[in-house]
Amino acid sequence: MPKIFIEAVFGGNMRDINLVLENIVYMEMLRRGYDVTVGKIGDKEIDFVCEKAGEKIYLQVAYLLATEDTIKREFGAFDNVKDNYPKYVLSLDEFDMSRNGIKHLNIR
């Protein structure tokens, strides 16, 4: 199997990679039977609010959490969510950066 490098396919545009990852997560949540919407509270947007059988899951998707600004943005999206449903940040980072009750998971 030949190696394909992300930059060769997408160029240096990380936003495109984020969109591909968001699409993968969206399709997977639909496959699992969730109703999937985009959340918005104030000026912050949550990538996906997934609901099934009265349960809810909040998801943020990022390629990498490489800078403090990215970490603040992705985890900060949940700042105004006041319920206790699970909140996840998904990325390709291989080490756990969970914080403040928000779980970080590797997207693979």
Task: Locate the predicted segments by residue.
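A cross-kingdom feature that marks ATP-driven nucleic-acid transaction machinery
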Residues: 1-108
